[in-house]
Amino acid sequence: MIRVCMYANRINGRYQEHYLTYERSLIRAGIPFETYIDGRPFKWENRVRWQLEMVRRNPSDHFVFTDAYDVLFVGTKNELLDAVFPHLLMFTTDRMNDDGNPWPQPHIRKHYDERREATSPWRFLNGSGPVGHGYAIASAIEFGLGEWEFPENGTDQAFWTQVYLSGWGDLDQDCNISQALWNMKDGEFGVKDGRFLNLITGSKPQFIHATGNMWPFIPLSLIPPTGAVSP
């Protein structure tokens, strides 16, 4: 079984509109999903610990953890299964800065170079969460929480970057699973037969991640008036 899981501390105002659009795109595709609303003040550590709770409860399932407000599902259920099932642990990716370095820690590029050769501009870990088998995700989180004390204002992106650079998992450099639009460039994306395409890697990403304030750049032409994504 595959589960798409989202964590939020509020769903109201414009966030509600964006979340409901995402929810409808998953329902239309028949993708099981679960959303957890945490009423506590937001902390990235809480999201990581919630992810650990989820995978411990269902260790044999496959998971895709995403943000709740700035994501759309634009693929199909079968394509998602094909993209996720071969991997024990995978991380979605961000595009490199214009200087070739990762945000927000440019000094760690050398560690990425040592970990794996870059195969596309989307070569650095995105903070939306892990993808893969429940048991593998649980093991990775337990490793990270056992190795480092989560900083008071630390992000899950920094946490998962440390986990990845310590040898856990792989990066979705081809953007087969998710496409982040941060630092997008002209000529990198297109739409063919109603499907969003990465013209650099040739992939048809299953998710589009607008990375926060980039929401207006999501190709809303993929969404009919009902809010569901086109088949």
Indicate where each model-derived feature is located.
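A generic structural motif
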Residues: 33-41, 91-95, 152-157, 172-177
